[in-house]
Amino acid sequence: MSLYRDEGIVLRTQDLGEADRIVTLLTRRTGLVRAVGKGVRRTRSRFGARLEPFTHIDVQLHAGKSLDVVTQVDTLHAYGSVLVTDYPRYTAGVAMLETAEKVVSVEKDPALRQFLLLWGGLRTLAEGAHDPRLVLDAYLLRSLAVAGYAPALEECAHCGVPGPHREFAVHAGGMVCSLCRPAGSVKPSPAAVALMVALLRGDWESADASAERDRTECSGLVAAYLQWHLENGVRSLRLVERA
């Protein structure tokens, strides 16, 4: 087995046998990695606490046939210790971790931009400077954009004619003009659409100045769009407080 080192974020863990744990990581260079942490559930484990969701780690692994093996790990940032103390931030973070795994999906396919987005999102959540819903929605929109599913917000998703347009259709890919609008389209407020644009662009000044009703409407649109475009959806979004 070859030895390699990477930087990663723990997305999910699963107990294996009596003492081991399977860890799913999104790493900077390798992409999505599943590895076994041997003996990490034992009380005297050298690095059990470092292999928990939300933890940003420096990790050394042996490449295996089906699962890699963690041989060394150091904590770079323990975001979970902050997020678990605040329910809105915690649930937003859980949704981000699940989304990252769903968006990347293919193991060991480098996904640097997705890694950087997740790292930045967790760091911003932990800092607590913005509404957790805004941080989550900004992450979801950008992650989808990197994956090739960016919603059309300033032009018609079907014909490309410049907006502004009045209707939004998740199954069509975003805003649609009056000629292209399919059945099931909704009419979001211009302010909610403007907030989506601000979050996608990283315009935090505009996002932070948004009204509560617009944040709630924006969150609903983003959640619906994400669930439509990701296979099997993101279950943890149900836990996020949207109002």
From Swiss-Prot:
SUPFAM superfamilies: ArfGap/RecO-like zinc finger, Nucleic acid-binding proteins. Involved in DNA repair and RecF pathway recombination. Belongs to the RecO family. The gene is recO. Coiled coil: none annotated. One of its GO terms (biological process) is double-strand break repair. One of its GO terms (cellular component) is bacterial nucleoid. This is DNA repair protein RecO. It comes from Thermobifida fusca (strain YX).
